Amino acid sequence: MLPSGKRKADAFSCTSAARVTAKLALSFLALSTTPLVNAFSYEEPNAQIVLPIDASPIKPLLPEPPAPAEHKFTLRHIYHHGTYEHPTLHRKKDVPAQNADVWLAADDEYGQERIGTLKARSSPVRIQRLADRRPSVVDPMVAYARQQGYASVLSPEAWTMDEVAGPDITDKDTIISLALMAADAYVQTPDGADWEDVGAPFNRSLDFGWEGDGLRGHVFADETNSTIVIGLKGTSVAVFDGDGTTTNDKVNDNLFFSCCCAQQGPWTWHQVCDCATGTYSCNNTCVVQALRQENRYYQAGRELYANVTELYPDANVWIVGHSLGGAMSSLLGLTYGDPVVTFEAVPEALPAKRLGLPIPPGSDPDAPQTREYTGAFHIGHTADPVYVGTCNGATATCAIGGYAMESACHTGRECVYDTVGDLGWRVGIGTHKIRVVISDVLRKYEKVPECKFTPECRDCGNWKMYESNGTETTTTSSTPTSTSMTRTRTETCKTPGWWGCLDETTTTTGMATTTTSEMPTTSTTTCHTPGWFGCKDKTTTSTASTTTTPIATTATTTTTSSTTCLTPGKFWGCYDKTATTDIGSPSTSTELTITSAPALPSSVLTPSATATPPEGQPDDSGKRCRGRTWYGVCKDYEGGEGPVNDL
């Protein structure tokens, strides 16, 4: 018999080989559960293990919005792209950051201003844009949409909502810096760096005057080249270009910024198509067909953007512009999905619709101003008729120049300074200039106005736009009307006076139609003693004879009027006047006979068909006057006596 302690120790030890084998099998099962279950699943399936597992990838977390940052920008490049006179021209000038002096060009009463390092702040901006925004991908879509007449329809997967580092439009210094980037600047370099061709070599024989035509882009970059700003400036702006205006820019701008091709407006507008079918009724299909020729300012802006982004492929791009350059900046921002800040820009919602730019799902293609997340901010003031969309009246500067600026809506948000209410300004085109905006608006106000979204704005509200299948034809016919009149006037003046001729002989020949009654009238007046205000003695005899002959045909009548003045007045008129009117007989066999009146007493003159007193008729003294002065006083009588005052 074993001791008790020995028995307790042996109780915890396994002396059977079968038990050892079972423990090893259980250990292997614990280490490899899944393979063994799969191997023996045909005998005892386990419902919890064979359930399907969701293998879809986990969606990536949304990136954190960029943090606000400070940027210091300097001018790096100047790009110049021709538009109408030199459409193939594309040149670039590099600006050395250390040796160059950048100056703001003088404008009227504003002198030159040196531009140094420009500071700006960035803040998160939400933009709904295409996922693939490369110009090589977007440009063919825009060209196809313009040819088809409607925007391209893309799937929702092609769009993305991004938080990008855009300009802080609540910061005053940032707004002023961006306005200086959009202004007209020039560079003075010690080495006199010249322009270099970016695209095809430009014809050097046409190298004179090219800088006055086209769209110019000033490229600013920060210290790390992580953010660049493209400032667009039209050197030959199609709205206020003066002597450089051509027909082409009026055609393009009136297609984009007018309701119906500059029709039914002031006579000064340059009409560019015939799409109006009635009073404020326009065939929009006709307008789209007229738009197939690409706007050269928009084309120049896209090519300039492509070259700049190729030079800075990983940089964050901001676009700024003024006036027409501001409108082009906004269109580029809608095309490529970049933040935009404009100053006094022409309302561009109407051309954005007609260009057929890509739109996200759920947006109205006929109202681009209803898109909320565009990243565009339009800064302006209430005294600028171009910005507020009122530069289209009969006396407006735009209308006088032939431009129909009827668009009134901006895409994105509007930041409006109320200069009319706050400063008492009057609406005028002089407040549109960028130097006026910088000096008298941006720097004068302490705060930047709130930028508001205005989706309720509507362009061309009084027009009825309709689509058609393109089979309508418009026929306009007119009947030419010709009116001719032949008139002969023969005049011989023998005694000129202060106001006209004192003696006048006139002969008039014309066509007339006879009636059944004719009444010739002869009036003869002879003055022997003229006075200061008329004739002191005046005798007038009027004799009328009427002959009635029924004539039913049309005849030709010749009227002859003869006037002879023997005693001209001292200051004007004639003291004796004899007028004779003869009405010729019609061209028929019937002849009219004038019967002479019977003889009258000597106190009354004898009437006759033609009465012309002899030259040098004597006055009451019985003397004849042989010559008179220019004011009517007789200076020479017969008999050799001197001048006599006959008053």
Curated annotation (Swiss-Prot):
Keywords: Autophagy, Endosome, Glycoprotein, Hydrolase, Lipid degradation, Lipid metabolism, Membrane, Signal-anchor, Transmembrane, Transmembrane helix. The gene is atg15. It is a single-pass type II membrane protein. Its EC number is 3.1.1.3. Residues 1-18 are cytoplasmic. Its main location: membrane. One of its GO terms (molecular function) is triacylglycerol lipase activity. One of its GO terms (cellular component) is vacuolar lumen. The chain crosses the membrane at residues 19-39. It catalyses: a triacylglycerol + H2O = a diacylglycerol + a fatty acid + H(+). It is found in: Endosome, Multivesicular body membrane; Prevacuolar compartment membrane. This is Putative lipase atg15.
